[in-house]
Protein backbone atom coordinates (compact mmCIF):
# COMPACT_ATOMS: atom_id res chain seq x y z
CA UNK A 1 0.00 0.00 0.00
CA UNK A 2 2.85 2.41 0.80
CA UNK A 3 4.32 1.84 -2.67
CA UNK A 4 1.06 2.72 -4.47
CA UNK A 5 0.64 5.82 -2.30
CA UNK A 6 4.20 6.90 -3.17
CA UNK A 7 3.56 6.37 -6.90
CA UNK A 8 0.28 8.32 -6.69
CA UNK A 9 2.02 11.16 -4.85
CA UNK A 10 4.80 11.23 -7.45
CA UNK A 11 2.29 11.35 -10.33
CA UNK A 12 0.37 14.19 -8.68
CA UNK A 13 3.60 16.11 -8.04
CA UNK A 14 4.65 15.75 -11.69
CA UNK A 15 1.21 16.91 -12.87
CA UNK A 16 1.21 19.88 -10.50
CA UNK A 17 4.72 20.90 -11.57
CA UNK A 18 3.61 21.11 -15.21
CA UNK A 19 0.50 23.18 -14.56
CA UNK A 20 -0.12 26.46 -12.86
CA UNK A 21 -3.06 28.67 -12.09
CA UNK A 22 -4.60 30.68 -14.91
CA UNK A 23 -5.70 34.29 -14.66
CA UNK A 24 -9.00 35.16 -16.32
CA UNK A 25 -9.31 38.87 -17.15
CA UNK A 26 -13.01 39.75 -17.40
CA UNK A 27 -13.93 43.04 -19.07
CA UNK A 28 -17.36 44.63 -19.31
CA UNK A 29 -17.62 46.76 -22.47
CA UNK A 30 -21.42 46.88 -22.22
CA UNK A 31 -23.20 50.16 -21.55
CA UNK A 32 -24.69 48.59 -18.41
CA UNK A 33 -23.60 46.63 -15.34
CA UNK A 34 -22.91 42.92 -15.81
CA UNK A 35 -22.72 40.51 -12.87
CA UNK A 36 -20.13 37.85 -13.88
CA UNK A 37 -20.55 34.45 -12.29
CA UNK A 38 -18.33 31.40 -12.31
CA UNK A 39 -18.34 27.79 -11.21
CA UNK A 40 -16.49 26.09 -9.63
CA UNK A 41 -14.31 29.24 -9.30
CA UNK A 42 -15.41 32.86 -9.45
CA UNK A 43 -18.67 32.91 -7.53
CA UNK A 44 -20.29 36.18 -8.52
CA UNK A 45 -19.66 39.91 -8.41
CA UNK A 46 -20.70 43.26 -9.86
CA UNK A 47 -18.76 44.62 -12.85
CA UNK A 48 -19.77 48.12 -13.91
CA UNK A 49 -19.58 49.35 -17.49
CA UNK A 50 -15.98 49.72 -18.78
CA UNK A 51 -14.51 47.92 -15.75
CA UNK A 52 -12.31 44.81 -15.63
CA UNK A 53 -11.54 42.28 -12.92
CA UNK A 54 -9.37 39.17 -12.59
CA UNK A 55 -10.26 35.67 -11.41
CA UNK A 56 -7.46 33.22 -10.56
CA UNK A 57 -8.34 29.64 -11.49
CA UNK A 58 -6.22 26.84 -10.02
CA UNK A 59 -4.58 24.21 -12.21
CA UNK A 60 -6.63 21.05 -12.40
CA UNK A 61 -9.96 22.90 -12.63
CA UNK A 62 -12.23 21.06 -15.05
CA UNK A 63 -15.69 21.82 -16.41
CA UNK A 64 -15.39 25.47 -15.38
CA UNK A 65 -17.91 28.06 -16.56
CA UNK A 66 -18.02 31.85 -16.52
CA UNK A 67 -21.01 33.85 -17.72
CA UNK A 68 -22.48 37.32 -17.44
CA UNK A 69 -25.76 38.00 -15.69
CA UNK A 70 -27.88 41.03 -16.57
CA UNK A 71 -30.68 42.99 -14.95
CA UNK A 72 -29.61 41.97 -11.45
CA UNK A 73 -30.64 43.30 -8.07
CA UNK A 74 -29.01 41.96 -4.89
CA UNK A 75 -29.39 42.65 -1.19
CA UNK A 76 -27.10 40.83 1.27
CA UNK A 77 -26.11 38.24 -1.36
CA UNK A 78 -29.68 37.32 -2.39
CA UNK A 79 -31.66 38.66 -5.32
CA UNK A 80 -32.42 37.92 -8.93
CA UNK A 81 -31.21 38.53 -12.47
CA UNK A 82 -33.19 38.88 -15.69
CA UNK A 83 -30.69 36.58 -17.49
CA UNK A 84 -28.14 34.08 -16.19
CA UNK A 85 -29.73 33.94 -12.72
CA UNK A 86 -28.40 31.18 -10.45
CA UNK A 87 -31.18 30.45 -7.96
CA UNK A 88 -31.17 34.03 -6.67
CA UNK A 89 -27.62 33.84 -5.29
CA UNK A 90 -24.86 36.43 -5.78
CA UNK A 91 -22.18 33.72 -5.50
CA UNK A 92 -23.22 30.92 -7.85
CA UNK A 93 -22.93 27.18 -7.40
CA UNK A 94 -24.80 26.39 -10.65
CA UNK A 95 -25.21 28.18 -13.97
CA UNK A 96 -28.42 29.92 -14.93
CA UNK A 97 -30.38 30.20 -18.16
CA UNK A 98 -30.29 31.82 -20.57
CA UNK A 99 -26.58 32.51 -20.57
CA UNK A 100 -23.71 32.66 -23.03
CA UNK A 101 -21.08 30.45 -21.35
CA UNK A 102 -17.28 30.56 -21.46
CA UNK A 103 -16.28 26.96 -20.61
CA UNK A 104 -12.79 25.71 -19.76
CA UNK A 105 -10.57 23.00 -18.32
CA UNK A 106 -7.17 24.08 -16.91
CA UNK A 107 -4.11 21.90 -16.25
CA UNK A 108 -1.43 19.74 -17.76
CA UNK A 109 0.30 20.54 -21.03
CA UNK A 110 -2.95 21.67 -22.68
CA UNK A 111 -6.00 23.63 -21.59
CA UNK A 112 -9.35 23.46 -23.36
CA UNK A 113 -11.90 26.22 -23.84
CA UNK A 114 -15.09 27.02 -25.74
CA UNK A 115 -18.18 29.21 -25.86
CA UNK A 116 -21.57 27.54 -25.43
CA UNK A 117 -25.08 28.80 -26.19
CA UNK A 118 -26.68 25.41 -25.50
CA UNK A 119 -28.34 26.89 -22.39
CA UNK A 120 -29.33 30.02 -24.33
CA UNK A 121 -27.76 33.31 -25.37
CA UNK A 122 -27.82 36.53 -23.36
CA UNK A 123 -24.66 38.59 -24.05
CA UNK A 124 -22.15 39.08 -26.84
CA UNK A 125 -18.81 37.63 -25.73
CA UNK A 126 -15.22 37.20 -26.84
CA UNK A 127 -13.18 34.44 -25.17
CA UNK A 128 -9.49 33.90 -25.85
CA UNK A 129 -6.39 32.39 -24.34
CA UNK A 130 -2.95 33.95 -24.54
CA UNK A 131 -1.69 31.26 -26.93
CA UNK A 132 -4.79 30.27 -28.89
CA UNK A 133 -7.67 31.26 -31.13
CA UNK A 134 -10.00 34.12 -30.15
CA UNK A 135 -13.62 32.93 -30.07
CA UNK A 136 -16.34 35.46 -30.90
CA UNK A 137 -20.05 35.23 -30.19
CA UNK A 138 -22.19 38.21 -31.21
CA UNK A 139 -25.62 36.56 -31.45
CA UNK A 140 -27.43 33.29 -30.74
CA UNK A 141 -26.29 31.83 -34.06
CA UNK A 142 -22.56 32.49 -33.55
CA UNK A 143 -20.46 29.94 -35.47
CA UNK A 144 -17.72 29.77 -32.78
CA UNK A 145 -20.10 28.36 -30.14
CA UNK A 146 -21.54 25.01 -29.15
CA UNK A 147 -25.23 24.94 -30.14
CA UNK A 148 -25.83 21.25 -29.42
CA UNK A 149 -23.99 18.80 -27.14
CA UNK A 150 -22.52 16.95 -30.16
CA UNK A 151 -21.02 20.07 -31.79
CA UNK A 152 -17.25 20.25 -32.14
CA UNK A 153 -16.30 23.72 -30.90
CA UNK A 154 -13.65 23.05 -28.23
CA UNK A 155 -10.25 24.65 -28.74
CA UNK A 156 -6.89 23.73 -27.22
CA UNK A 157 -4.49 26.18 -25.67
CA UNK A 158 -0.98 25.66 -24.28
CA UNK A 159 -0.93 24.85 -20.59
CA UNK A 160 -0.04 27.74 -18.29
CA UNK A 161 -1.97 30.22 -20.45
CA UNK A 162 -4.08 33.16 -19.28
CA UNK A 163 -7.51 34.09 -20.59
CA UNK A 164 -9.56 37.12 -21.60
CA UNK A 165 -13.37 37.27 -21.51
CA UNK A 166 -15.00 40.42 -22.85
CA UNK A 167 -18.72 41.11 -22.59
CA UNK A 168 -20.15 43.32 -25.39
CA UNK A 169 -16.85 43.42 -27.34
Swiss-Prot record:
Stored SUPFAM superfamilies: Osmotin, thaumatin-like protein (SSF49870)
CDD domains attached to this UniProt entry: TLP-P
Gene3D superfamilies: Thaumatin
Domain of life: Eukaryota
Leader sequence residues: 1-21
Family recorded in the similarity comment: Belongs to the thaumatin family.
General function of this protein: Associated with resistance against stem rust fungi.
Protein name: Thaumatin-like pathogenesis-related protein 3
Origin species: Avena sativa
Taxonomic path: Eukaryota, Viridiplantae, Streptophyta, Embryophyta, Tracheophyta
Gene name tied to this protein: RASTL-3
Amino acid sequence: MATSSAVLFLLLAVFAAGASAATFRITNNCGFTVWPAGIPVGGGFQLNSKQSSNINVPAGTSAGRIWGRTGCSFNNGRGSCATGDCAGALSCTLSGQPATLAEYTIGGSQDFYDISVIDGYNLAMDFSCSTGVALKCRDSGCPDAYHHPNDVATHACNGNSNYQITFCP
